[in-house]
A protein has these predicted regions:
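A generic N-terminal leader/anchor concept
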Residues: 1-44, 176
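Conserved beta-strand/loop scaffold segments within soluble protein domains that form the structured core
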Residues: 25, 37-42, 46-189
Length: 189
């Protein structure tokens, strides 16, 4: 099942407790972004259809994602740039997702000696769905990526994420999950 025909006309309430940049995804699809706290030429965020260069021949969820992916985002931090503020990914799931499968793909690239704090903030309207995400993360030499996943409210969704990529010499990838309750959450690295 694809979620291309789902409509969205709500205003997402952004966190106002601290300054941050953001990416908005609705049902896995890239909607908008704002990087007002960063140097525009040092950070690139665009919509991504799917991960064309990734190949996982023994993973059926990968084939499902490749066939039905509606998008996601590509984020790149330029060489020697340390992001001044975190980027929050507002991952919003609408109420009309019952028995739907969300397939999305994201790609994150940190060039040499760069730093980024990424917060994935999941918000759900109580529908039962399956989220199938494939993420390619490349962290070049001397770079640092801190990834924090926060589940705002209890969710009836089933979350699967496959993370692949390259971590270069003297680089660091830190991942934290703060959940208020999920039916199922599996992350494969």
């Amino acid at each position: 099942t694809n979620n291309d025909d789902l409509k969205f006309d709500k205003q997402i309430k952004l966190i106002d407790d601290f300054e941050h940049n953001y990416i908005i995804l609705v049902n896995g699809i890239f909607k908008s972004c704002d990087i007002k706290y960063e140097e525009k030429k040092k950070l690139k965020i665009v919509s991504l259809k799917s991960l064309e260069e990734l190949s996982l021949p023994n993973n059926n969820l990968y084939y499902l994602n490749k066939a039905l992916s509606l998008g996601g985002f590509f984020l790149e931090v330029q060489k020697d740039y340390k992001c001044k503020k975190p980027i929050i990914i507002y991952n919003y799931f609408t109420s009309d997702l019952d028995n739907k499968i969300i397939n999305n793909s994201n790609q994150i690239k940190l060039n040499q000696n760069s730093e980024l704090t990424l917060i994935e903030y999941n918000m759900s309207e109580k529908s039962k769905f399956f989220k199938n995400t494939f993420e390619n993360i490349n962290i070049e030499q001397g770079s640092l990526l801190k990834s924090i996943t926060i589940q705002k409210n209890k969710s009836n969704g089933y979350f699967y994420k496959n993370i692949s990529g390259i971590q270069d010499y003297n680089s660091s990838y830190q991942s934290f999950i703060l959940s208020s309750g999920l039916k199922f959450n599996k992350i494969e690295i």
